Curated annotation (Swiss-Prot):
Effect of mutating residue 67 to V: In strain: Eta/B.1.525, Omicron/BA.1
One Pfam family this sequence matches: CoV_S2
Residues covered by region (Heptad repeat 1): 920-970
Effect of substituting residue 417 to T: In strain: Gamma/P.1
Spans traversing the lipid bilayer: 1214-1234
Listed result of changing residue 19 to I: In strain: Omicron/BQ.1.1, Omicron/XBB.1.5, Omicron/EG.5.1
Effect noted on mutating residue 26 to S: In strain: Gamma/P.1
Outcome, altering residue 490 to S: In strain: Lambda/C.37, Omicron/BQ.1.1, Omicron/XBB.1.5, Omicron/EG.5.1
Protein name: Spike glycoprotein
Result for mutant: residue 701 to V: In strain: Beta/B.1.351, Iota/B.1.526
Impact reported for residue 190 to S: In strain: Gamma/P.1
Gene: S
Effect annotated for changing residue 614 to G: Increase of pseudotyped VSV particle production ex vivo. Increase of viral load in hamster upper respiratory tract
Amino acid sequence: MFVFLVLLPLVSSQCVNLTTRTQLPPAYTNSFTRGVYYPDKVFRSSVLHSTQDLFLPFFSNVTWFHAIHVSGTNGTKRFDNPVLPFNDGVYFASTEKSNIIRGWIFGTTLDSKTQSLLIVNNATNVVIKVCEFQFCNDPFLGVYYHKNNKSWMESEFRVYSSANNCTFEYVSQPFLMDLEGKQGNFKNLREFVFKNIDGYFKIYSKHTPINLVRDLPQGFSALEPLVDLPIGINITRFQTLLALHRSYLTPGDSSSGWTAGAAAYYVGYLQPRTFLLKYNENGTITDAVDCALDPLSETKCTLKSFTVEKGIYQTSNFRVQPTESIVRFPNITNLCPFGEVFNATRFASVYAWNRKRISNCVADYSVLYNSASFSTFKCYGVSPTKLNDLCFTNVYADSFVIRGDEVRQIAPGQTGKIADYNYKLPDDFTGCVIAWNSNNLDSKVGGNYNYLYRLFRKSNLKPFERDISTEIYQAGSTPCNGVEGFNCYFPLQSYGFQPTNGVGYQPYRVVVLSFELLHAPATVCGPKKSTNLVKNKCVNFNFNGLTGTGVLTESNKKFLPFQQFGRDIADTTDAVRDPQTLEILDITPCSFGGVSVITPGTNTSNQVAVLYQDVNCTEVPVAIHADQLTPTWRVYSTGSNVFQTRAGCLIGAEHVNNSYECDIPIGAGICASYQTQTNSPRRARSVASQSIIAYTMSLGAENSVAYSNNSIAIPTNFTISVTTEILPVSMTKTSVDCTMYICGDSTECSNLLLQYGSFCTQLNRALTGIAVEQDKNTQEVFAQVKQIYKTPPIKDFGGFNFSQILPDPSKPSKRSFIEDLLFNKVTLADAGFIKQYGDCLGDIAARDLICAQKFNGLTVLPPLLTDEMIAQYTSALLAGTITSGWTFGAGAALQIPFAMQMAYRFNGIGVTQNVLYENQKLIANQFNSAIGKIQDSLSSTASALGKLQDVVNQNAQALNTLVKQLSSNFGAISSVLNDILSRLDKVEAEVQIDRLITGRLQSLQTYVTQQLIRAAEIRASANLAATKMSECVLGQSKRVDFCGKGYHLMSFPQSAPHGVVFLHVTYVPAQEKNFTTAPAICHDGKAHFPREGVFVSNGTHWFVTQRNFYEPQIITTDNTFVSGNCDVVIGIVNNTVYDPLQPELDSFKEELDKYFKNHTSPDVDLGDISGINASVVNIQKEIDRLNEVAKNLNESLIDLQELGKYEQYIKWPWYIWLGFIAGLIAIVMVTIMLCCMTSCCSCLKGCCSCGSCCKFDEDDSEPVLKGVKLHYT
């Protein structure tokens, strides 16, 4: 029952030590998938979000504590409330039914020496306080059960005895709590996550109704943000506050006579983890993946998907995270003497500034930074808040006094009397400028004239140059001879500080701290305490201010005495010298990149196998740092299903000797699939089960090869040739660990990378598409193969020589003799020799070789042949080919003209191309010259504008410095991104890291583009391999030289890494018989063609034979067919050589307008009109230079070597000439008919008669004999 209680004030109370309780070691239970919380307050809907933060790892062991009382004489009474470490954060869950868990204590010492945080529910209010508490050894709250009125009430608050110096306090609105001790199962699950980040104590919570006897429930429920407390204290330990039950009140015996209501709470520790969170349309987290849990979870995070299709995937590194942090500074105990500098009685004048070297000491810069007395504290190249984390070789402190309005000149890139003539900082200055008003010290009534500055100097000072000379300054041309006078001035001027001057004219003391970066051993470090050195584990490290994440191992590198860090070829820090032991350590990444996960698809099974690329199985545990992995990951570093392949070590797939069609290509001839396996060679199975198996890629059933035992008849005049052909059908599958490539182990960079959206996802999606295409290529190539062929080593056996490949037989070709008639014209580009060749040739084609010309020492012929020339050379080549096997060299001699004319024509093409190339080079040189002139003009213009800018704005040097800094490429900055973060503020560091990310993203995009191009090339090769698999392996190709060299017999495929090897067995002719051939036989006006092969003649008779071997057969209707007539149609192909395109040079006016149009000057601050330099501007030289450039541009004319045009006439074909003759005959016949019909003979005085003229006699010509005639083409 409920009772109304008054607020129980939290005042100091008497502490009591509890007795008679049982001390037992804590138990452990599984956290399952509990502990996920909303990482930020951003609303997300229907999206997957990857985040890096402190999370409770899934399925981790959480510590189990009890509050319980088992009745009986020897009953157990447990009241567990030990002090526990806080670490990086805590997951706290309680299962209860009687409101036993009441709150927590957070702090360091948990006593009055330091502040602590108290969060407690006193049954009426929730109270939160930050004070210097003196907590009790056994803090608890008491609940009293009043037997008379059967009611429960809060009776004791024994948590602390004193509370002082409270800085934070919160008391909630009053409420009522049910204090009754209940029986039965636990009814409430309350979960909390505690984090202490940047001075804020963050609490997340969730309440879930349950009905459990013990342990945590399975299931998923995200904790929501409860409160952020700005407490600003350090927390290293915490303790849980419980309530106990009493049945009576005995003031003198408060340590005994108590019972414990049943409750349990569970404590787990947060670790740096990457989680993939799934938000529904309402913005609720409905599911999550712990990316470091196991290989499948890592694959999901890599793909950013909760479902994974069947295949093999490269993973990112989520599995190894740093376990601890180490700090290694030199063993230095002396404090740096900054007080001697800042508290000096008198400071130096600015022209004679003083310098003190500080070394071999500990520097606590926070004392300076937090001081309220400094009006200026600006740092360059380093953040003042990060100074205590850094080390330097030396620190130099420069001190002097200047006027208040001159402090701004003590900065990089400034100008003015102080910066130019007294104290100059370099543009790349790394250090801090500290200034404060010293009017009460350095001013006096009437003026303090002891502080001087240099007013005149012939030239500006160099950085950190000190000039204390007092030589008279000569302003004119007359020598001063050391005497002041007209145009002769004393160079120093006094300030004359007075207390009544305005702030801008009051004295300011300035101290400039210059930090010498680590080019030698560190001697000045912040006040951090060094920790023990940890090797061979993933850690966060800090060596003399160099921070990062990695594994430290012993190194065999040699350092020079001054060397502190080592860098590899990529400018990455890969080694460091320990500042205490001086040992050299290698720094390697925590991750092992070559890890691929094979999965049958999450819709099929959650089983996976893991391939560690290019690693021996014995080295896997060391390579992946197995001792730092989760238990579910660790099982994939060793085990029974370990299979060493050429691609690496495969773990998790059962290796079988059977062969199957390739389901998931792994590489190096190994495949995997998910199927029922009942005959495992590794262990006997009584029941068939599903598993991932690995096997060697197979092409089908096994058979022997017939030709290996000479079972195939081979003609005696042929020889066997075996040609090896390798075609790639896939390439190495790649996946980019985008986050690791860009950010390494930097968490800040990874968080910033998330702002780039899905770039990394899209990049890997493209690479995954390439990988899927490779699998598709492989499957398409091998899917058609039904039989496997095992070929023996290719040697000489059976009397056949398999090492030689003879030349290919040529195809005879002839032209019609009727074609030798009139002309067609073709135009060629003439480099200077074709016209002379034409004059020599005349109309005699046979003089082709005789008329070869000389051009630049080469014998050349035009790259054009008429049909007559083709017929001549072809006849000679044919004759040489036919006789080559019988005439012992005579046939080869007949082939010489053909080879010579081809060589000469190639020379002709070559020299023509050379002329074209020279012209293109002229164009390029002249264009480059023109561009150079433009650049000169722009430089001149920039120079002129620069003079204007110097006159208007004296801060131009700062702009130049900025341009210089921005122009450095992203590789020039330290590759350790944490080094940037250690030196710069967050905003500045994010700008620098953003620039690095952009540069590396561009590199990745270029890489993916190259991969896509390669994938397209591989796809084309795979298509060719598939065609050859179909035509060469499964059939016999009729295409010469397509399946090997020569005439195809058979082909045998073999799998190869990323491709297929074809062994093409072909036969090539060893001897050739002389024969005459014709493409067709004309008989009775009809053309007879062979069904297969060609017609050949043995000198007396015609036969039909196959084209690839000589087997004459009598010509019959079975081996011939009739089609068409004997007319031959000849086609002429015009051969035109095009001149190279010569684009007109664009006008440079528009290009120049972009630079000269709308050019505005920067805004000028006229606040101090006296600061403007009113010197005269003289840019006449620049104008003259521009005029000269314009003249040079006009002279950028291109004089090309002229290509002549040569016109050659080609003879018309015979049918044109026949048509022409037929037309002439028709005209003559018509004329004769007209003469006869009009008595034409009477006009000739009887010389002829019309009768004879018009008489038509019978045809007395002899009949044409019927027979067979041959027609050649």
